[in-house]
Curated annotation (Swiss-Prot):
Organism expressing this protein natively: Bradyrhizobium sp. (strain BTAi1 / ATCC BAA-1182)
Active-site positions on this chain: P2 (schiff-base intermediate with dna), E3 (proton donor), K58 (proton donor), R283 (proton donor)
The organism's taxonomic lineage, starting at the top: Bacteria, Pseudomonadati, Pseudomonadota, Alphaproteobacteria, Hyphomicrobiales
Record protein name field: Formamidopyrimidine-DNA glycosylase
PROSITE patterns: FPG_CAT, ZF_FPG_1, ZF_FPG_2
EC number: 3.2.2.23, 4.2.99.18
Catalyses which reaction(s): Hydrolysis of DNA containing ring-opened 7-methylguanine residues, releasing 2,6-diamino-4-hydroxy-5-(N-methyl)formamidopyrimidine; 2'-deoxyribonucleotide-(2'-deoxyribose 5'-phosphate)-2'-deoxyribonucleotide-DNA = a 3'-end 2'-deoxyribonucleotide-(2,3-dehydro-2,3-deoxyribose 5'-phosphate)-DNA + a 5'-end 5'-phospho-2'-deoxyribonucleoside-DNA + H(+)
Keywords per UniProt: DNA damage, DNA repair, DNA-binding, Glycosidase, Hydrolase, Lyase, Metal-binding, Multifunctional enzyme, Zinc, Zinc-finger
Example GO biological process: base-excision repair
Cofactor note: Binds 1 zinc ion per subunit.
Function: Involved in base excision repair of DNA damaged by oxidation or by mutagenic agents. Acts as a DNA glycosylase that recognizes and removes damaged bases. Has a preference for oxidized purines, such as 7,8-dihydro-8-oxoguanine (8-oxoG). Has AP (apurinic/apyrimidinic) lyase activity and introduces nicks in the DNA strand. Cleaves the DNA backbone by beta-delta elimination to generate a single-strand break at the site of the removed base with both 3'- and 5'-phosphates.
Keyword Glycoprotein attached: no
Zinc finger motifs (FPG-type), residue ranges: 257-293
Length: 293
């Protein structure tokens, strides 16, 4: 599933052709994705100007001139493609040419900017939903989300407070979207490695008995910031389905330190350890037992 860097990469790719442009027409080419489309979905979007395109955790939010918000989630395999009228592209180093088969092109936005925005989702776990601007805080998919890890409010003190007294593992706590929003398996593994913290460590150890942040909390927040920012600059990680809106692959997977590197040498200078994998809460965890404590 796309994580925060992949969704932010998509947002930045859509922003130039969506923000300030009008949705001339919208097509929903089937009745549902993960959930059924609202009966008047396409009609409500037609003629609306996109005033802004934001992101909350792994969700995209298009602010519409009607006062509504278009909530979008990529699901497991969803991707957006921007097709301009001239359809000219300058492929990057990691460009992956998408085929012409449009059987999985389920939603199309025809924009006044001259671009068609196509949502392709083979597994149909993505969804789109129109909500009122005043309903955002009550929206079930958004209301319980924790702070944005790249937001100004997310710091060691906030993370320590959220983890104080927790008896769960550090990795499980970071994957809890109520603790911090948008992190997934890949970037949690990578951040824990950079902070030299074991995924099995108790989350409560990020706080002192007085609830103040420990050194571990400060190192971890720095690592989360670094990993996410580097991944966004690299266009995210393309392991299966993620593509940028140009069709280009993300390439942060070439910078993985532990994720999907089972049996390979640890990249920490002087460590000499080997990357291991174990199943934790139903997901593969990659780590170096020698330098992550």
């Amino acid at each position: 599933m796309p994580e925060l860097p992949e969704v932010e990469t998509v947002r930045r790719g859509l922003q130039p052709v969506m923000e300030g442009a009008k949705i001339v027409a919208a097509e929903a080419r089937r009745g549902d994705l993960r959930f059924p489309f609202q009966p008047d979905f396409a009609k409500r979007l037609q003629g609306q100007t996109v005033r802004g395109l934001g992101r909350r955790a792994k969700y995209l939010l298009a602010d519409l001139s009607s006062g509504d918000v278009l909530l979008m989630h990529l699901g497991m395999s969803g991707s957006f493609r921007v097709i301009k009228q001239d359809d000219e592209e300058t492929p990057g180093e990691f460009h992956y040419p998408r085929g012409k088969d449009s059987v999985h092109d389920h939603v199309v936005f025809h924009m006044s900017s001259g671009a068609d925005i196509v949502f392709n989702d083979p597994r149909r776990f993505g969804f789109m939903k129109i909500i009122g601007r005043g309903e955002i805080e009550r929206e079930p998919h958004l209301k319980d989300l924790g702070p944005e890890p790249l937001g100004n409010e997310f710091d060691a003190a906030m993370l320590a407070t959220a983890c104080a007294g927790k008896k769960t593992s550090l990795k499980a706590a970071l994957l809890d979207q109520r603790v911090v929003a948008g992190l997934g398996n890949i970037y949690v593994c990578e951040a824990l490695f950079r902070a030299h913290l074991s995924p099995r460590r108790l989350a409560a150890t990020l706080a002192t008995r007085k609830g103040e942040p420990t050194d571990h909390a400060r190192r971890l927040v720095e690592a989360i910031h670094a990993v996410l920012n580097e991944a966004i600059r690299a266009g995210g990680s393309s392991l299966r389905d993620h593509r940028q809106t140009s069709g280009e692959l993300g390439y942060f997977q070439h910078s993985f330190q532990v994720y999907d590197r089972e049996g390979e040498p640890c990249r920490t200078d002087g460590c000499g350890g080997v990357v291991k994998r174990f199943v934790q809460n139903g997901r593969s965890t990659f780590w170096c037992p020698k330098c992550q404590r």
